[in-house]
């Protein structure tokens, strides 16, 4: 049976939970679209996160890798379009590291684009009644670090799709951040199942607008 690798992060930035791991862990050992889903937690640490991710890819030989992260303040499930080759941390990671304007891969390309059918994934989520959109930036913290590192690793591995999805706060987190949007864990789980099915089945992305004016 083919394998799908899906990752989430440990809590960071003073939060007690990270919605990415809270939801991703629920998918561990699930069978979706004929594939076994394996969930792995990544440390919210520059460098170490990619060490754990790369080891999992090497051990599992997945056909699809989805990295999931928290984006507090976003209202939608946001499927990332691109990762850039820069670490520029507004806050320290979980080991106190705070790189500023450092490349993720020395002499690497400026950016890597997701190899997922990002617009088809967003469309399928919306059809299921789940708020979703394409995101034009994964930030410059550990999420972008992981997305760039993932796509850089997959560049020489044939027939493996990969990319990154940001998810909102859970309601219990938003309660501590008055006015912040949130999404229930079960809704996010449904969205990630849709993302997996769509990514596995759609080879050519749909041609619909997903851009932004700013």
Swiss-Prot record:
Q: Name one Pfam family in it.
A: Peptidase_C15
Tell me, what is one Gene Ontology molecular-function annotation carried by this entry? pyroglutamyl-peptidase activity
- Which biological processes are named by the entry's GO terms? proteolysis
The GO cellular component terms are: cytosol
Q: Where in the cell is it found?
A: Cytoplasm
Major subcellular site: cytoplasm
EC number(s) of the enzyme? 3.4.19.3
Reaction catalysed? Release of an N-terminal pyroglutamyl group from a polypeptide, the second amino acid generally not being Pro
Q: What class of enzyme is it?
A: hydrolase
Instruction: Tell me which domain of life the UniProt entry assigns to the organism this sequence originates from.
Output: Bacteria
Q: Which CDD domains match?
A: Peptidase_C15 (cd00501)
Q: Which UniProt keywords apply?
A: Cytoplasm, Hydrolase, Protease, Thiol protease
Q: Please list the residues that make up the active site.
A: 80, 143, 166
- What does this protein do, in the record's words? Removes 5-oxoproline from various penultimate amino acid residues except L-proline.
Q: How does it assemble?
A: Homotetramer.
Say which family it is in: Belongs to the peptidase C15 family.
Q: Which PANTHER family match?
A: PROTEASE FAMILY C15 PYROGLUTAMYL-PEPTIDASE I-RELATED, PYROGLUTAMYL-PEPTIDASE I
| Name used for this protein in its record | Pyrrolidone-carboxylate peptidase
Which species? Citrobacter koseri (strain ATCC BAA-895 / CDC 4225-83 / SGSC4696)
Its gene?
A: pcp
């Amino acid at each position: 049976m083919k394998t799908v690798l899906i990752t989430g992060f440990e809590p960071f930035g003073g939060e007690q939970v990270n919605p990415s791991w809270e939801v991703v862990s629920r998918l561990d050992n699930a069978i979706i679209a004929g594939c076994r889903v394996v969930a792995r937690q990544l440390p919210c640490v520059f460098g170490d996160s990619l060490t754990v991710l790369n080891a999992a890819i090497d051990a599992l030989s997945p056909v699809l890798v989805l990295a999931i992260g928290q984006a507090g303040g976003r209202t939608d499930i946001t499927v990332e379009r691109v990762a850039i080759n820069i670490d520029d941390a507004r806050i320290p990671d979980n080991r106190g590291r705070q790189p500023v304007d450092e490349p993720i891969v020395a002499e690497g390309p400026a950016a890597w684009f997701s190899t997922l059918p990002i617009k088809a994934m967003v469309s399928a989520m919306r059809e299921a009644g789940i708020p979703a959109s394409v995101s034009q930036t994964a930030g410059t913290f550990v999420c972008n670090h992981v997305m760039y590192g993932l796509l850089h690793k997959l560049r020489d591995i044939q027939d493996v799709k990969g990319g990154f999805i940001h998810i909102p706060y859970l309601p219990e987190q938003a309660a501590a951040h008055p006015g912040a949007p949130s999404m229930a864990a079960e809704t996010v789980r449904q969205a990630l199942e849709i993302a997996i099915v769509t990514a596995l089945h759609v080879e050519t992305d749909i041609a619909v607008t997903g851009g932004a004016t700013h």
